[in-house]
Amino acid sequence: MYTLQYGSKEKIENITELVNEVFKDYVIPINWTKESFLLDMAENSIILDHSQILYFGNEKLPIGFCITSARGKRARIDSFGIKNEFRKTGASYFLINNVFYDLAKKGFSSLQLEVESSQTRAVDFYIKNGFKISRTLDSFIIPEKTSCHKFNYSLNCSKSSIHHDVLLKAKRAPNWQREITSIQNSKKDYFMNQIRSEDKEIAKILWGRTEDTTYIVDIYQTDFTTEYSDIIQDATSYLNSFGKPLITVSLPQNDPLNYVLLTSGSKIFLQQYEMILSL
């Protein structure tokens, strides 16, 4: 009835078409092109050899997928879905249990994912299959401020200047997409600014732009004589000067950047659960 195949570079266009179809009606629709998939593949450590496509019947109709990322002994479901007409048929359970078996056999110790908190059926499905909610991720709209920043912002700072010890010293709690591996591997057109006060570096900011928004990837404090909240307030004023709505997405609630944004008037427009399973 069901068969599974691993992903491959030759199947990328078929994978993106299937994923886009399944997620077209979701709160956050996915609209991958081959090019954007390859960018996400690099940034999020997607491994096609660990990703699976689910087929139905002798004609091998593609009906579902699990796109999987991997770092060390940790695996992550980047996206998981079944075509609408095959839901409630047992296909989801067949796929997820085969994913568990395959990853455990390959030596992975844990599997994590993010799911939109209002998608109660999806949340219940993952809980029934052994996942536990580890924390909540908030996406913010940051209020517009007058662009009267007091610090200096120099462009073309290298991403390679950000190291794991910077996050540790600042007591950060990054999610998968903000881990140093994601930042170093990313091929996306991000901007990196060095933030300076009185000829001294106090922080770095990684950010990007779309046609509709400016978005913060992260703000890294490198000098601890300046309050992190002051750095964030100034950085958001700087980014507001580009004249587009300012957002940041999937920010863990136990991360200091989340607390500063929340207490300074930013509004949550989406919440996700980060969930984890021991394999």
Task: Report the location of each language-model feature.
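Active-site rim helix/loop that mediates acceptor-substrate recognition in acyltransferases
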Residues: V27-I53, G57-N58, P62-I67, K171-M192
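Conserved beta-strand in the GNAT
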Residues: I53, K60-S69, R76-G81, Q194, ...
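Residue-level recognition of the GNAT/N-acetyltransferase active site
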Residues: D78, K83, R87, E116, ...
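Conserved acetyl-CoA-binding loop-helix of GNAT-fold acetyltransferases
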Residues: I82, K88-Y101, D124-K128, F224-L239
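Conserved active-site alpha-helix within GNAT-family acetyltransferase domains
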Residues: T89, Y93, S117-R135, Q253-L270
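Conserved catalytic-core motifs of GNAT/GCN5-like acyltransferases
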Residues: Q112-V115, K132-K145, K267-S278
